[in-house]
Regions:
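Short hydrophobic beta-strand element within catalytic cores of glycosyltransferases
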Residues: 275-278
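Aromatic "clamp/platform" in nucleotide-sugar-dependent glycosyltransferases that forms part
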Residues: 258
Length: 345
């Protein structure tokens, strides 16, 4: 089958975050099943991401010579009336924008309007979680139920990378790892305030923050104001090999986000057999029901969740085993076959 992928998300792990990972792994898994995948991305890069996305969509030509066209998120909205066009949403922009402010809120609002047109025009809609599917119907007024195909992870490659890495460097430290783009909805500020509460309760605590984004500078400033030097380390964007090392070394993975359409980082943490502390919000409980889930936006609740794992090695081990078993259902070959079934309906 010849499949055309449309995406203006940067296919670069340093810029594209989870969306990049999901599309890249899906394309590779489909190729390994024998399908031909052509990925169209912007040829012109602009300093304003929304302008870049709009320009990319304006330049899209009708599909010719393909059995199927899949547009990710808002991409493909102008040609979505073509027969068999599929809108595949990694998240729901109209849901994400609720948590943003200022220019980010304005530009994401424009993207959300395009995404709404995309799902209303497409022949089929695929979402990554039941939560995401419900938001598509609620926020975009889609009458039909979207098909749900979860995010995926290439476990063979991931585990090979973990096995080939260096020995963990924790050296007696209790390392709490966050990975993600630094948007307001990720609530890294809550993690920083939790770190203040935990310093006296976990003397060997270190919080390591991987990722960049609009909130990077304000978060660094907040960490300085909270006097978290020596407790919190901002790593910025990292290479894939360094990312693997961060997961290997981590004692606990933490995702305090209040909005996730799925959360590929949760799959990465499970693949690395790490216990997880996360917010009981959006798609997170659906993806990691075995994790330590806490009420969102509460620094003390998050601190207690992290401390509970610190004080219970047995619980950590049990959660690690549960995650390592659960992540098998998201392995790339299996999910790629589910995706094929969805586009064939």
């Amino acid at each position: 089958v010849r499949i055309r992928f449309l995406t203006s998300t940067p296919l670069d792990i340093r810029r594209g975050s989870g969306t990049y990972v999901g599309i890249a792994v899906l394309a590779r898994a489909l190729r390994e099943l024998g399908h031909e995948i052509a990925i169209e991305t912007p040829r012109v890069r602009l300093p304003v991401y929304t302008a870049e996305r709009l320009l990319f969509n304006r330049g899209l030509k009708p599909s010719a010579g393909f059995d199927c066209t899949v547009g990710f998120d808002m991409d493909g909205y102008r040609i979505a009336t073509e027969a068999g066009h599929i809108a595949a949403l990694k998240g729901v922009i109209a849901d994400e924008v609720r948590f943003e402010r200022g220019l980010a809120r304005l530009t994401m609002g424009i993207q959300a309007r395009c995404e709404r047109l995309h799902v209303l025009r497409a022949a089929r809609v695929i979402a990554t979680s039941r939560y995401c599917a419900a938001q598509v119907r609620s926020l975009y007024g889609v009458a039909r139920e979207p098909l749900v195909v979860p995010e995926l992870i290439d476990l063979a490659r991931w585990r090979a990378a973990l096995a080939a890495g260096r020995a963990p460097r924790s050296a007696g430290r209790f390392l709490v790892l966050f990975v993600g783009r630094l948007y307001r909805r990720k609530r890294v500020d809550v993690l920083l305030r939790a770190a203040v509460a935990l310093r006296g309760r976990i003397p060997e605590l270190e919080v390591r923050i991987v990722g960049n984004g609009p909130c990077a500078a304000p978060l660094r400033q907040l960490a300085a104001e909270l006097k978290l030097h020596g407790t919190v380390t901002f790593l910025g964007d990292v290479s894939r090999s360094q990312l693997v090392e961060e997961y290997r070394a981590a004692s606990v993975f933490c995702l305090p986000s209040v909005q996730e359409g799925f959360g590929i980082v949760l799959l990465e943490a499970m693949a690395a057999a790490k216990p997880i502390v996360a917010s009981r919000a959006a798609a997170i409980p659906e993806v990691v029901p075995h994790a330590t889930l806490v009420e969102p936006d509460g620094a003390e609740a998050l601190a207690r969740g992290i401390e509970s794992l610190y004080r219970s090695p047995g619980n950590c081990a049990a959660q690690s085993q549960a995650g390592a078993a659960r992540v098998e259902q998201f392995d790339a070959p299996r999910v790629a076959r589910l995706f094929c079934e969805a586009i064939d309906r």
